[in-house]
């Protein structure tokens, strides 16, 4: 699609966001608007398991919500055992006006199985409140190590890292990354594969 790849064949960020949202195993939230600032909201959380990966297996879906200072506003964990439902409503996240009063809100959803994070997705809202506010948020540091086509990214800072991505200047039209524009918590590492040696 031309919307995900530009004229020169360079993959746009939206490609990676769509890739996450159409994964066969995903935890998702539904929003009826993108500006939640200073409003009471109830947001439904769903587990999508197209291939029944979690069938008869215990799992957790952890939801973490952060404000523009990257302080935790709320967390909630849904515990379950996989079944034959492809779409399963896990519950609702209720936030009051004080919790949503922020120029940015970030929602991070993790699926945990056998104490291992097997999926992560994140959303951001309230960006219309003060356009450009994301550039004044707390910063962190990322360490990158590369061996062949394996790249390890580590957040060595004190704040979450949002939208971490790999670029290879002069070869962007050839680059494909297994996962890009990711969320990394402090001291967390992620191993990615790239198609370039």
State where each predicted segment sits:
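Carbohydrate-binding surfaces of carbohydrate-active enzymes
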Residues: 1-179, 184-192
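Short, charged beta-turn/beta-strand-edge "cap" motif at the junction between a beta-strand
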Residues: 195-196
């Amino acid at each position: 699609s031309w919307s995900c790849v530009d004229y020169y064949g360079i993959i746009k960020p939206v490609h990676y966001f769509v890739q996450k949202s159409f994964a066969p195993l995903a935890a998702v939230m539904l929003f009826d608007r993108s500006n939640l600032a200073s409003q009471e909201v109830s947001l439904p959380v769903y587990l999508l398991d197209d291939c029944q990966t979690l069938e008869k297996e215990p799992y957790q879906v952890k939801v973490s919500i952060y404000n523009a200072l990257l302080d935790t506003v709320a967390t909630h964990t849904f515990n379950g055992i996989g079944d034959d439902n492809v779409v399963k409503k896990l519950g609702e996240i209720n936030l009051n006006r004080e919790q949503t009063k922020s120029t940015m809100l970030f929602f991070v959803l993790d699926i945990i199985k056998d104490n291992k994070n097997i999926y992560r997705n994140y959303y951001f809202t309230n960006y219309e409140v003060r356009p450009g506010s994301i550039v004044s948020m707390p910063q962190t540091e990322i360490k990158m190590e590369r061996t062949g086509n394996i790249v390890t990214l580590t957040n060595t800072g004190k704040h979450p890292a949002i939208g971490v991505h790999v670029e290879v200047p002069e070869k962007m039209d050839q680059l494909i990354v297994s996962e890009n524009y990711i969320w990394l918590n402090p001291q967390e590492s992620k191993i990615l594969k790239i198609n370039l040696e």
